[in-house]
């Protein structure tokens, strides 16, 4: 017996795929409804506006990001190792065709208005990533944990942008080694 996907999930999964591959502004509700096979009335019953759908997607992606972060870093025995493990995994991901950049950067670029709901979710996510990097940098014994966290943050976002711009031929093959250089410079004696 085949299990049926709920209409709300069909809409969400379709929107998530389209937003990530093509952008938020480029994809309209008509396209999402047509691609999901769900009527617009049903779509609007679950997501009263496109912004609601964008926010739901970003919140779900935030949860995925942190679950992945924990999975990637849990076996690293030290804070330094956790940072390195994250950047090694990120390097592997941004070199794949599945990577279309960072959905949080993408939404902030397409909706630069600070009061846009998607922009707000993106800002919250990025602030929490910076805070986690800062915590790990401090625990790793960085001389200036704020500077190291910000450098790593910029490196991460640069890798996402390079993936979006260059696809699989991006300069990310040096991402993990660049992170290691920054970490070593702040934590070596």
Regions found by a protein language model. Give the residues of each.
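Basic, helix-initiating cap at the start of DNA-binding domains
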Residues: 1-22, 26-38, 52
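Alpha-helical DNA-contacting segments of helix-turn-helix folds
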Residues: 54-61
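Hydrophobic alpha-helical connector segments
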Residues: 56, 70-96, 139, 145, ...
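Amphipathic alpha-helical segments used for helix-helix packing
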Residues: 96-117
């Amino acid at each position: 017996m085949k299990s049926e996907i709920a209409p709300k999930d069909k809409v969400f999964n379709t929107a998530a795929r389209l937003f990530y591959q093509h952008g938020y502004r480029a994809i309209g509700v008509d396209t999402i409804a047509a691609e999901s096979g769900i009527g617009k009335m049903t779509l609007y019953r679950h997501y009263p506006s496109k912004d609601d759908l964008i926010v739901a997607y970003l919140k779900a992606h935030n949860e995925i990001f942190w679950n992945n972060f924990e999975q990637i870093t849990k076996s690293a025995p030290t804070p330094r190792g956790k940072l390195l493990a994250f950047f090694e995994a990120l390097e592997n991901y941004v070199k794949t065709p599945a990577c279309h950049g960072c959905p949080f950067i993408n939404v902030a670029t397409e909706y630069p208005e600070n009061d846009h709901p998607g922009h707000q979710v993106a800002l919250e996510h990025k602030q929490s990533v910076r805070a986690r990097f800062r915590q790990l940098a401090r625990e790793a014994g960085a001389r200036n944990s704020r500077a190291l966290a910000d450098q790593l943050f910029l490196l991460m976002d640069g890798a996402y942008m390079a993936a979006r711009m260059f696809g699989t031929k991006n300069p990310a093959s040096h991402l993990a080694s660049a992170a290691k250089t920054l970490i070593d410079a702040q934590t070596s004696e």
